[in-house]
Amino acid sequence: MVQPRFVRPTQSSPSSISGEPNSSNLYVANCGPAVGLTHNAIAAVFAEFGEVNGVYAADDSGVRVIVSFADPFSAKAALEALSGRPCPDLKGRSLHIRYSVLQLPSETQVNDCVPVSLIDSELNIPGLFLLPDFVTVAEEQQLLAAVDARHWIGLAKRRVQHYGYEFCYGTRNVDTKKRLGELPSFVSPILERIYLFPNFDNGSASLNLDQLTVNEYPSGVGLSPHIDTHSAFEDCIFSLSLAGPCIMEFRRYSVSTWKASTTDAEKSGDSSCIKKALYLPPRSMLLLSGEARYAWNHYIPHHKIDKVKDKVIRRSSRRVSFTLRKVRNHPCSCKYPQYCDSQQQM
């Protein structure tokens, strides 16, 4: 959900006591969707005092909103007329109103200053493709309902489900001798659509994806930088984003080994790595193949908010990803030996 972020003015800000309005934005408590008042209905009432740019949820309660006017004098007029009084046009509710100011998150809170692209071609990473609206809203709800009806495995900060083969986080690999069975039927439509993936020339007709990991990320939880172990999976990795958006950052280090990064310096990146970031909207499918799969770390910052171009995007309460892969049954012989566990061990 894209929305501005508002906070209470500081004590040093001009106040209404001085006779001058200090903001064109009002924090309004005791009204909202949770008590049967839509944002449009609220906007119509406040529009009597001036042009309303928008009405936004102030938090997740459903009973507190931000009313943003085009100018501060309209906000002042509305505050003086409505605050502390029952409003007949809003079901007679008494409104509690104060000024609010717009505040963008600090640079350290959003994307670590890495510019975010909206389309895959802007990154210029060979083998990386993003297809928006890969599934419909109805299909998204069906997929979420299907996994929510099944058993989740709790990890430290997220929940997972494994199908086909279990992914072992300790070794970052799979045990090919312990197959869990066929992939569930609810992913069949996804598999059929994957074989028609645009720009996919890696033998899709013969690709037999046989491993699925479903991850549920609460708001603010991301993913540490890593390259999927070369010996564990074949070339193509597909990741479907559901329920919420995120920023995925890609990092290529000038010096690297196949071992998973463990130090804080490696996790945060350093001057020897190239960083690029891509916005993954809900219902989009990401394909990592070739160089993108074998040589670039992928990473989801641990943020509750992200900055995309000039907009601040608040992450939803959950994001669910479906990652589909083909288990490898032979050593990897890719063109990127410095990142390859198979070739490093030869």
UniProtKB/Swiss-Prot annotation:
- Asked if the record carries the keyword Metal-binding, the reply is yes
* InterPro entries in the record: AlkB-like (IPR027450), AlkB-like_sf (IPR037151), ALKBH4 (IPR032857), Nucleotide-bd_a/b_plait_sf (IPR012677), Oxoglu/Fe-dep_dioxygenase_dom (IPR005123), RBD_domain_sf (IPR035979), RRM_dom (IPR000504)
Q: Where is this region: Disordered?
A: 1-21
Residues that coordinate or bind Fe cation: 226, 228, 298
Task: Return the cofactor note field.
Answer: Binds 1 Fe(2+) ion per subunit.
Species of provenance:
Arabidopsis thaliana
Q: What is its EC number?
A: 1.14.11.-
Q: Which family does it belong to?
A: Belongs to the alkB family.
Q: Quote the protein name from its UniProt record.
A: Alkylated DNA repair protein ALKBH8 homolog
Per UniProt, residues of the RRM domain are 24-102
Which lineage? Eukaryota, Viridiplantae, Streptophyta, Embryophyta, Tracheophyta
Low complexity composition-biased segments: 12-21
| Fe2OG dioxygenase domain boundaries | 208-328
